Structure formats: structure tokens, C-alpha cells
Amino acid sequence: MKYPTLLDRFLVYVKENTRSDENSTTTPSTQNQVEFAQNILLPEMERIGLQNVHYLPNGFAVGTLPANDPSLTRKIGFIAHMDTADFNAEGVNPQIIENYDGNPIALGTSGYELHPKDFPQLANYHGQILITTDGTTLLGSDDKSGIAEIMTAIEFLIQNPDIKHCEIRVGFGPDEEIGVGADKFDVKDFDVDFAYTMDGGPLGELQYETFSAAGAKIDFLGRNVHPGSAKDQMINAFQMAIDFHNALPETDRPEKTEGYEGFFHLMNMEGSVDTASTTYIIRDFEEEDFQARKQLMLDIAEKMNANFDTPRVIVNLHDQYYNMKKIIEKDMTPINIAKDVMENLGIKPLIEPVRGGTDGSKISFMGIPTPNIFAGGENMHGRFEFVSLETMEKAVDVILGIVAYK
């Protein structure tokens, strides 16, 4: 179905810089997110007719659409995140490509282009309306597509009261991209039977498996002496960091894994001969494999420390989120409903694991099962990001089908 306000709404959202900051200690991590919620989303939620619209200390803008059919007793939530990833988000200047013809798309005057040889999925979008960047910023489809789709669906229901639906709660939150947005999610305030994050990618994605995730910080304590007299005395902290990294499986890296394969990802290395540190993210799907990856890091450190008279490799691990499959599989109702709705709309459900995490990962373990549905974005987190308006329209169709499902 066509929704006249969807594109304009999306364009308003993406032009707002809501980049999150992993080094911040505030919630939300950036003031821009607060202003986006308070100055744009909350007034719009009230304008279109949502009830009990409020802004929580955890950074979530929340509202309710009461049921208009007493036989539809479920309470269903829809969640999307306001922040964008760690890439330039200032001065987003979207391009609208009408009736895409399959050729390369110049991204403004940046010198970059979306080329089918680099991004073969462009072949799926012949004849569609694409929204791209101008090559200097990301687009922000992740996850302002989701916000626009939820808002458009709610507006459509309010303007068409003959469409019967259950009670709906919507929540637009901060800091998903830095992994902390749902840490303070208020389950009691949201009060639904289950929810969906509208935070997936291409048409049909329906996801209830995520990585289990941990972070690791490894400190290396060296001993610096003059290199001219260093034999049997110098202990180079940088070399220890290199040795540690090389002891990890070479094939278990993001660029060499797919599907259900986990990985270690070296994110940062800094220091000197005297001291050095590295940070990693650890990802896997099965609990046994996830625990084994963390143990391997501890084992490597123990083996390296055996060469010294005092521990010089110190590993600090912290879990970040867990595979929500463990929760969702207890009651597959939200998956079955979404799957039926997609199939009734002629959309083939793509039920596959998320090689990442969503706010739903944490919210599911807090007590609200929250799988993930496509929002349309492709090549997210960078200058080559784009989204199809037709896919966004179908995401709105899916939301409308879910809330009317009997």
C-alpha cells in the first residue's frame, strides 16, 4: 500500500544528527538524541493521536494506541532506535532515485557511487524508489526507517478507525548502536505481551536469533629498556599483544565468517613497549561455543604468563547481551503471527540469525519477547547505505497486519 506521509517523514528524521557516543556516560549518550525525541518525535506522536505520550528517564519516547476491538486482547509493542552508527551523520542530504534502472548511482559529487558490481543486491530494486546518501554521510535508515514505519502505521490506524486492532505500544529509544540503549528499558511501563523491533534489513527479514556477545580488554605489562642492551631484558608489550592476537584462530574473524559462525574481532590496540592494551568483541550463537571463546582467551593468557615470573597478560571479560532464541522459543506466537502476516501479503519470510544484536536481545531477557522485523535498510552504517521506499511501505503493511491478527 502507498502511504503519502512515509517518505517525507523519513526525510525529516534522517536530516537530524542523532549519532550516539560510546565514550559518553549519560543516557542518552548524546544531547542530539534527547532533542530529537523531545522536539520532533513526542510532538508528532501527540499530533497523530497517540495517548499517554511521555518521555522516560531512560531516553525512550513512549505512547499508546488503545484497542478498538474488544476481541483483540493482545497488547503488542513496536520499538525502533533513534541513534545512528559511528559514521558522519552531520548534514545528511538524501538523494531520491525514482524508478531505479539498474545502473550505478553517483552519490552526489563525492566521487563515490553505488555500483551493482560492488552491491549486487541492487538488482532486487529495479523500478523502485531508492533513497541514498550523497556520499559524505550515512543515511540513517538504521533505524529511522523503523521509526517512520511505526509512526506511519499508527497514523494510518487512527485515520482509518474501521480497521480493528489490538492495543499498541510504541517506543523509540536511544543508543542501540553502542549496545546500551535497552539497559534501562522499563518493562513495567511498556506493559505488552510481546513486541517487535523494526530494525532489520531487506524485505522479509524476521529474526529471533542473535549473537551472544561479550567484550574483552587485555592489558599487557612490558618492561622497557634501551634497545641497544635489551637482550634477555626487554619485554615488549606490543609484541605480547601481537602474539596474543596471533594465538586466536585466524579463520574466526568477521571478514572470514558468515551464517552461524562466531568470531573474535580486534577493535583497538594502543600503548607502548612498556604497556599496551587491546579490545575485542566476542560473538557466537550457541551458549557452549560462546563460553568456549571466552575461555580460549583466558587460556592463551595463562599460557603466555607461564613464561614470566609475574602475570603480564591480564584479561578482563564482560558479557554484553545473549541470544534471545532461548526466550523466544518458549512461545513462538510473535514469530508465527509475523510469518503468517508476511505470507498473506505475498512476502517471503527470511527467518535467519542476526549477525549482531538488537534492543530486542536484552528486552527479551527482561520479560518481553521481542523478535526483529525488516525495516528495509541496506549497506547500513556508512556512505553506501540506501533504502527502498517500497520495502518501507511493505514494513508498514506488516505492522498493520500484526495488530489486526486474529
Curated annotation (Swiss-Prot):
Catalytic activity, reaction form: Release of the N-terminal residue from a tripeptide
Binding annotation for Zn(2+) 2: 142, 177, 381
Entry's EC annotation: 3.4.11.4
Required cofactor(s): Zn(2+)
Keywords: Aminopeptidase, Cytoplasm, Hydrolase, Metal-binding, Metalloprotease, Protease, Zinc
CDD domains recorded: M20_peptT
Details of cofactor binding: Binds 2 Zn(2+) ions per subunit.
GO MF annotation: an example: metallopeptidase activity
GO cellular component: cytosol
Chief place of localization: cytoplasm
A biological process term (GO) from this entry: peptide catabolic process
Binding site for Zn(2+) 1: 81, 142, 199
Catalytic residues in the record: 83, 176
Keyword Cytoplasm: yes
Localisation per UniProt entry: Cytoplasm
Pfam families xref list: M20_dimer, Peptidase_M20
Signal peptide range in chain numbering: none
Family note: Belongs to the peptidase M20B family.
Role played: Cleaves the N-terminal amino acid of tripeptides.
Stated name of the protein: Peptidase T
Gene: pepT
